[in-house]
């Protein structure tokens, strides 16, 4: 073994290994104290990029779940108000049926109409005051809203809310009134029993209804027979014996064409009907009460269709939240395997580094004494 003074190779080697052990110890302590296996790009450049992408995805999924829950909250708020509106419409229908009874006096019908009018006002109040986060939901101003339910752009669903005010055109339809009233002794003529209705629905479907009335039926029996042939139209008779036809708004686009021998007999002509909504109903007369039932039935169907759509949206959002939670769980698990510290493994590494550091320190101290042996040769 060569003994030198200017260059202590043994000390240099011991120093190098001591520095390595110290660096490994510092890295282990950093990982254990932070809980992260990757604390800078030098630890794992590729792993850091993947981890950051997974973190962004996970945070996006978390926000998406909050957005979906907001959507459910809006739908629940609107649906709750619609539920109360349905109860109001049901009560108004009861009042209309009660008023249509022939035993009622004019004053009794007036009292029933006053309650019906008060319920109309409450229906409008609910529509105008139901809100979520400052946005009105049921007065027609909400329109459509997009709910971001994914971690990336474009992953959204659209939810729309429409007006349920008593004067909204969808809360009713069109009314048609025959010109000729018929008394109890009138019967359907044998040679004029045919009645034909033609109209186009809002969906663009051309509908033709052919009704062949029974010979000798009176005007009330005729209305009952028409109602039994179709649910597209509602027939009733007013106090003057005039046949009334009501078509709900979703079932009618444009004019209603009415033809046939019976149409001529009754003076029932098609054409622009009278726009009739819940706001317009008047149950102070038998005819108005009868027609009001058809209007309210149309309004109930409209509100029910809106509630059904909201229910479907709620179910969709609930399933979306469940799916997002499952995706987030798997993304977090993947990110954990890449980024998080394995404490069992890292503790072992730290113990190893501590032992090597202590050994390196001891060996370096001994290596520094080697040049001193040259002095003994000079004595």
From Swiss-Prot:
Residues making up the signal peptide according to the UniProt record: none
Primary localization class, coarse: secreted
Molecular function per GO: structural molecule activity
Keyword set includes Methyltransferase: no
GO cellular component, one term: bacterial-type flagellum
Places the protein is found: Secreted; Bacterial flagellum
Keyword check for Secreted: yes
InterPro entries, per database record: Flagellin (IPR001492), Flagellin_C (IPR046358), Flagellin_C_sub2 (IPR042187), Flagellin_hook_IN_motif (IPR010810), Flagellin_N (IPR001029)
UniProt entry keywords in alphabetical sequence: Bacterial flagellum, Coiled coil, Secreted, Virulence
Coiled coil start-end: 103-128, 302-341
Disulfide bond entries: none
PANTHER family: FLAGELLIN
NCBIfam families, per the entry: PRK08869.1-1, PRK08869.1-3
Described function: Flagellin is the subunit protein which polymerizes to form the filaments of bacterial flagella. FlaA is essential for flagellar synthesis and full motility. Important for virulence at two different levels: is needed for crossing the fish integument and may play a role once the bacterium has entered the host.
Subunit (UniProt): Heteromer of multiple flagellin subunits including FlaA, FlaB, FlaC, FlaD and possibly FlaE.
Assigned protein family: Belongs to the bacterial flagellin family.
Protein's name according to its UniProt entry: Flagellin A
Gene: flaA
């Amino acid at each position: 073994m060569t003994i030198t003074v200017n260059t202590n190779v043994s000390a240099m080697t011991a120093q190098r290994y001591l520095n390595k052990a110290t660096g490994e110890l510092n890295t282990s302590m950093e990982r254990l104290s932070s809980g992260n296996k990757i604390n800078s790009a030098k630890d794992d450049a590729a792993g850091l990029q993947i981890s950051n992408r997974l973190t962004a995805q996970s945070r996006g999924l978390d926000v998406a779940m909050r957005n979906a829950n907001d959507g459910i909250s809006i739908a629940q708020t609107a649906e709750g108000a619609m539920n109360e509106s349905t109860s109001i419409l049901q009560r108004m229908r009861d009042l209309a049926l009660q008023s249509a009874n022939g035993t009622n006096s004019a004053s009794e019908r007036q009292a029933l109409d006053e309650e019906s009018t008060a319920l109309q006002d409450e229906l409008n109040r609910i529509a105008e005051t139901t809100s979520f986060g400052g946005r009105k939901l049921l007065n027609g101003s909400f329109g459509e809203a997009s709910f971001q339910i994914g971690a990336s752009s474009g992953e959204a669903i659209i939810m729309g809310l429409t007006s349920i005010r008593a004067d909204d055109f969808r809360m009713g339809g069109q009314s048609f009134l025959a010109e000729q009233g018929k008394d109890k002794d009138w019967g359907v003529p044998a040679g004029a029993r045919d009645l034909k209705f033609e109209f186009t629905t809002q969906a663009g479907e051309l509908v033709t209804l052919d009704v062949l009335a029974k010979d000798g039926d009176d005007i009330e029996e005729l209305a009952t027979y028409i109602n039994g042939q179709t649910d597209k139209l509602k027939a009733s008779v007013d106090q003057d014996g005039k046949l009334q036809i009501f078509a709900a708004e979703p079932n009618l686009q444009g004019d209603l064409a009415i033809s046939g021998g019976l149409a001529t007999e009754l003076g029932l002509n098609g054409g622009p009907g009278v726009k009739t909504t819940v706001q317009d109903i008047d149950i102070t007369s038998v005819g108005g009460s009868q027609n009001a039932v058809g209007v309210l039935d149309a309004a109930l169907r409209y509100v029910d269709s809106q509630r059904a759509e909201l229910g479907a949206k709620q179910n969709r959002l609930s399933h979306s939240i469940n799916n997002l939670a499952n995706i987030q769980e798997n993304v977090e698990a993947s990110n954990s395997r890449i980024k998080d510290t394995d404490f069992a493994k890292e503790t072992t590494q730290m113990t190893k580094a501590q032992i090597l550091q202590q050994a390196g320190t001891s060996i370096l101290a001994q290596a520094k004494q080697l040049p001193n042996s040259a002095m003994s040769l000079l004595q």
